[in-house]
Amino acid sequence: MSARRDLVLAAAAILLAAVLIAAWGHQAGRPPVKMITPTLTNRLELCLTCHDGIEEISASHPVAAFGCTTCHGGDGLALDADLAHAGMYGGPNPADLAVVEVACGGVNCHSGDPATGRDHIQRVNRSIQATYAGAIAQVRHAFGEQPDLTAHQGTHAVQDDQVVVSPDAVPSLTAFAPSATDPQPVQQFSANCLNCHPWAQPAAKPYFYRSTGCATCHALYDNDGLYKGSDPTISRTEPGHASAHRLTTAIPYTQCNHCHNRGNYNLPRMVFVERTDLPALSAVKTEDATARRLAEYYQPIGQFTRCEWELDCVDCHTAREAMGDGDIYSSQADAQYIQCRTCHGTLTEPPKLAAITDLNDVAVHQAQVNGKYALQVGDQVVVTERGEKLGQVRWSADQLVQTMKATGQTYNVPLVQGSACQQKPDEQASRYCHACHDRELKAP
């Protein structure tokens, strides 16, 4: 009975498509109709008629399998733009956190089993980036709204029924929504200082352009916010678009900079003060790459180790640091655990290594999705204090080698053991390494 019903529905869809195509073809200047039938849905789609040339979103989301409406929603049989786009999830961005469960969820997609790393949506919603709970707790505590720095509120309400990773985690947050009776600085903080998290819309200006939700990090934007791809329907002159219709885990530091390192907060006034020393956009092609990176990345008087300005942020910060590990934290310090010693070891201990024993290992899947490095059974890779395998840092020929996730470039990782380093056993946090290993941009 079910098979017969499916045949009837398929025949009806084909008949409807034929009618639409005939009507479309009678209008002058229309592009030829382009039809696909994605294997995951087995439903005809006409979206590529207008969006012919658009980039495939990623190798793990092939259009032949997913099509367009699986992720975007909308009406895949409509050839009128307004009708086709009606009912789309999140408008142009199905990765927005308000709709991501509908667009990207499902046990086989991004809201599945934590054991297989498929619980991306749950983890992101609880992450310190999404909740902004640390900053909110600091401000509320400073102005007498709560007795300590334990987080009680976030940008949105979130619940964790089972704290599994860290004893520093909290079980839930309520939504931060100051009223007219709250201290004025708390109200100003709410109005002026909550636009740098994945729920918030970015400032529509150069250097700040980005998307929201998962696409905040995974959809790359140029500093000018202009589209450089091949979809004829997307403007090349209107800022506010990703550089291409793609998602990636090969994320360069420039993407992180759309939120981070764009200025500082004026705490007495509770306003964001933008940097005035950023290079002009026109200097991108003409300025020495190293000089530009130092100028754009570092604020004056900041100390940074050599690796921090040669590598990208994702080469040190793991997915579970940035996207969350499933627990709800009160501060960034509670969520962050990668230190210099993770890869470089100490005077008394080398970095911890673990073997890849199964091709279904999460680390192998991460390597396949990234595409800049590969893993096989038997490889020895660095493992964090929380048991997370860093597949891009691998033991090879008596040497620890790191592969950059954004470019594929490799570096030999020097170990503290056997070096001239004079670190103290009780001073292992990265800030102590910075005291000697720094590249400082002097104030003008």
Region annotations inferred by a language model:
Residues 2-42, 48-55, 93-103, 107-431, ...:
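Extended surface/linker regions that mediate inter-domain or inter-protein docking
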Residues 68-70, 76:
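Active-site-surrounding "flap" and adjacent substrate/cofactor-binding loops of secreted or lumenal enzymes
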Residues 79-95:
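N-terminal juxtadomain amphipathic helix
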